């Protein structure tokens, strides 16, 4: 049979092993590099563009997919297709091109006990209100990384100004982000790479984290703290900060690449694989295995028969229109290089190298 060549950044050794075996059981032969060979979305997309041998591209985020769909990469174009489950992924689609697999978002959490707000409920209009909350907050310890970038995007959302020469964000926005970094609790310690541990230890009252690992982390919270967070699905001493704007989600998608010399019959096999991988059953199994949340609502129903977890009911402002017809995710994509320059040049994380 035909070997289906896959490029992805969702390619930990566990994921690639699972995918090769599950695909084999479903009658497909696939080839995919794990993250010892290709690490990150930039590397995955560059390899696919340079090697020109890919059949399937999956993972990435809206930033990258809008580029692929719009023909940014010389050798990457997508086959026109519509899977039978297209309706089940709703708004997570580039119709006829790419369809949603997995969503995750960033969360703002706080302690409600005496190490936190002592029972006071936190309710913000914007993410950026954290700088005026009156409590100690965590801030991440580097510019790079998907989660860190998403947190910055969430904090900058309320300061969109298409007329601003500073990356389309008002000067107040950059001042607020500076304040967030300068006055947030920081450590170069490895446990401070993300915001769960500082909150779990009680070093801060308010923190940020990514959705896909939250429930698992709370389940195991007592292993790494004397003052652990308690109550996974029914919080006892913690909660989500209620934020009117919502939060910033990223979604992973799957698309079928055009490939020179591939026969019609082989293309049909590739389509059949994409159909299988994005289906409710497969995505529910993938979500179960890797603690991820499916775009496919039928898969979510299989995974969560008791209803959608609270962290995935939050409004998604990445898909809100901010400048004419442009979504905030597209706006972030258009300005991301400028934002990285601003963050770096202004030394937002200035103390880190010497900390």
Descriptions of predicted regions:
Residues 68-79, 90-96, 217-242, 308:
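Ligand-binding "clamshell"
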Residues 1-66:
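Early extracytoplasmic/lumenal segment of secretory-pathway proteins
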Residues 252-326:
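Mature extracytoplasmic/periplasmic domains
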Residues 315-355:
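Conserved C-terminal helix/tail region of periplasmic/extracytoplasmic solute-binding proteins
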Residues 154, 161-239:
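Ligand-binding pocket segment of bilobal, Venus flytrap-like solute-binding proteins
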Residues 52-57, 74-112, 138-139, 244-246:
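A structural signal for short loop-to-beta-strand junctions that line the ligand-binding cleft
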Residues 83, 87, 104, 175-181, ...:
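Periplasmic-binding protein-like
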